[in-house]
Amino acid sequence: MLKFRLYDKELDIDLNEWSKKDYSKYQNDVHKFALFNETISQIYNSYIANPDQMGSIFDKVIVVELDSLKIAVIVVNYFIDEKDNKKVLGINPILVNPKLINKGYGQRIIKYLIDIKGKIFDMLPAKIYAGIDVNNIRCKHLFEKLGFKLVRQTDDNDFLYYELEINE
């Protein structure tokens, strides 16, 4: 069974290995689409240092484990959608362990989030929202396959935003 827990910068220092260029054959994609050339520790530190730039409810860096194996890291944001005043679980990015890419773990994690209706840390959102790099074909396909609908694209056409209503 999947387990979500908060990232711990001391306990999870090994996750920085995922950003090393020789860690896996998918490293270029990992850097381009998920890490933006930063380590997981740097992403975490950025969230801690800039709370005013984050979600309106909270932002967390989550480690996903399966049988004690760290399989992914997700940055989640809970916020209120100003259009309809609904609670939203935002996912951006989801980073599957590069050695486990293309083995179904990303799909399993997103399906699990849908199954639990996005409820993490006692928050129950009305929808799940995902920001995806326009060139990340695999990720776009995954979210579309799981029923997410494209709701907007950034003005610079770099990112797509997908949404799935889960709790009315």
Regions found by a protein language model. Give the residues of each.
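Conserved GNAT acetyl-CoA-binding A-motif
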Residues: 119-132
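C-terminal "cap" of GNAT-fold acetyltransferases
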Residues: 151-168
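Acetyl-CoA-dependent GNAT
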Residues: 5-99, 116
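Extreme N-terminal starter segment of soluble prokaryotic enzymes
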Residues: 1-3
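Conserved acetyl-CoA-binding loop-helix of GNAT-fold acetyltransferases
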Residues: 96, 102-117, 141, 145
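Solvent-exposed beta-strand sheet faces enriched in polar/charged residues
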Residues: 77, 129-131, 151
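Short acidic/glycine-enriched loop/turn segments that link adjacent beta-strands
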Residues: 85, 136, 156-160
